[in-house]
Amino acid sequence: MLNEFKEFIARGNVMDLAVGVIIGAAFSKIVDSVVNDLVMPVVGAITGGGFDFSNYFLPLSASVTAPTLSAAREQGAVFAYGNFITVLINFLILAWIIFLLIKLVNRARASVERDKAPDPAAPPPQDILLLSEIRDLLRQRA
């Protein structure tokens, strides 16, 4: 059973998946930075400044009166939809970037396939040529 597990782990697909997960985790930090440091300030400038989704919430009890999400969570239950909006924006940006990368890779593959000329047919081996000549001579005698 241990040997089967080793074979399973050593397969290329499992290793590729592991590398993809690690790179994806690192890439998600880049997307978070793009959203929080580049996109959200632009959205804030368009909507009148100071626009921040993180403090958007609905109190689920009457005891919640705080203006910020962290303080409201200390007072009671809240429906923090602002964080969801931020995560949704992160996902959409990540999905768009992955779509563009896949499109770029597919275009590069198609270009390589288009530029690739078919290999010329290799000449037949010497023994095949000799056998063909013998066949032709036998046909001429008959």
Swiss-Prot record:
Disulfide bonds: none annotated. One of its GO terms (molecular function) is mechanosensitive monoatomic ion channel activity. Gene3D superfamilies: Large-conductance mechanosensitive channel, MscL, domain 1 (1.10.1200.120). It is found in: Cell inner membrane. The keyword Transmembrane applies. Keywords: Cell inner membrane, Cell membrane, Ion channel, Ion transport, Membrane, Transmembrane, Transmembrane helix, Transport. Belongs to the MscL family. This is Large-conductance mechanosensitive channel. It comes from Rhizobium meliloti (strain 1021). The gene is mscL.
